[in-house]
């Protein structure tokens, strides 16, 4: 299978992101390589193939694939972490919002409240437009052994297209699954925190918390555990720390509630060890 394919006329090629990822992973030890170096190595690997074929790859193609590759790196290690530990939580990669609504993870009796909210807002010419966090951290008490058996072959030492498919489709096992407290938190990841990405994350975190509060209100849940929203990138600067402390807007509309940050914490995830450290902290919070 080819890691790149010709795109129309001329010398432009597109990246077959999963095939390229699997092919490159067979040449390196991801367990000991910084993720930023994996991404730059993939770029060189693909560009070398494009040059060999007399073609070129656009920066836009790499930008799209970088996000996929970074999520697969984190997603695969997160499953390894689950298999190696005794945790009752699993980190599930979410698809794009255009193909799946993250609220569908909740049981239908809960998600229907969100659909009802959307419908009522639309009557007032207002749209509830949400993006999906990249990962949901879900309580799987009672299903641990089933999931361990299902996911036992996922490993950096054995990456295949089947591995990628399992990571990408794991969410299907959790549709109509969660009670209000079963989703512990969300994690969204970017290779880098550009200013526009910081705004996107703050908006997403604020909205996820507002929707949780809406469900809490509709179900009359007293003293809920709440939901947390985290962000991560291969590197973090002071501007990122400050920018992602933006307030969750729903928390300043009621004087009886304490202000909340849209993003609870940010993490540097640039290696397997960073993934482990991040997940250990999130699961103990």
UniProtKB/Swiss-Prot annotation:
Single Gene Ontology BP annotation: DNA restriction-modification system
Catalytic activity: Endonucleolytic cleavage of DNA to give specific double-stranded fragments with terminal 5'-phosphates
Protein keywords: Endonuclease, Hydrolase, Magnesium, Metal-binding, Nuclease, Restriction system
Pfam families listed in its UniProt record: Bse634I (PF07832)
Top-tier EC class: hydrolase
Residues in the signal sequence: none
Cofactor note: Binds 2 magnesium ions per subunit.
Superkingdom, taxonomy of origin: Bacteria
Protein known as: Type II restriction enzyme Cfr10I
Organism: Citrobacter freundii
Lineage: Bacteria, Pseudomonadati, Pseudomonadota, Gammaproteobacteria, Enterobacterales
Gene: cfr10IR
């Amino acid at each position: 299978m080819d890691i790149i394919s010709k795109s129309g006329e001329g010398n432009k090629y597109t990246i077959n992101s999963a095939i390229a990822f699997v092919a490159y992973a067979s040449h390196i030890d991801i367990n000991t390589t910084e993720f930023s170096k994996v991404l730059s190595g993939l770029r060189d690997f693909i560009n070398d193939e494009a040059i060999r074929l007399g073609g070129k790859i656009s920066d836009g193609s790499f930008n799209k694939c970088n996000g996929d590759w970074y999520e697969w790196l984190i997603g695969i290690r997160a499953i390894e972490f689950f298999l190696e530990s005794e945790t009752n939580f699993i980190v599930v990669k979410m698809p794009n919002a255009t193909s799946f609504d993250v609220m569908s993870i909740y049981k239908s009796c809960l998600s229907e409240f969100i659909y009802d909210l959307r419908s009522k807002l639309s009557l007032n010419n207002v749209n509830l437009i949400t993006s999906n966090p990249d990962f949901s951290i879900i309580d799987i008490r009672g299903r641990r052994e089933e999931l361990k058996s299902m996911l036992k072959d996922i490993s950096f030492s054995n990456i295949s297209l089947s591995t990628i498919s399992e990571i990408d489709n794991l969410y299907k096992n959790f549709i109509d699954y969660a009670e209000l407290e079963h989703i512990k938190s969300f994690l969204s990841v970017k290779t880098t925190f550009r200013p526009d990405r910081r705004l996107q994350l703050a908006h997403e975190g604020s909205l996820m918390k507002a929707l949780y509060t809406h469900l809490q209100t509709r179900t009359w849940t007293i003293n809920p555990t709440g939901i947390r929203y985290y962000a991560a990138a291969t590197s973090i600067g002071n501007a990122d720390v400050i920018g992602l402390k933006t307030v969750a807007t729903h928390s300043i509309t009621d004087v009886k509630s304490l202000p909340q940050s849209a993003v609870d914490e940010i993490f540097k995830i640039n290696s397997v060890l960073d993934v482990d450290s991040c997940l250990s902290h999130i699961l103990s919070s």
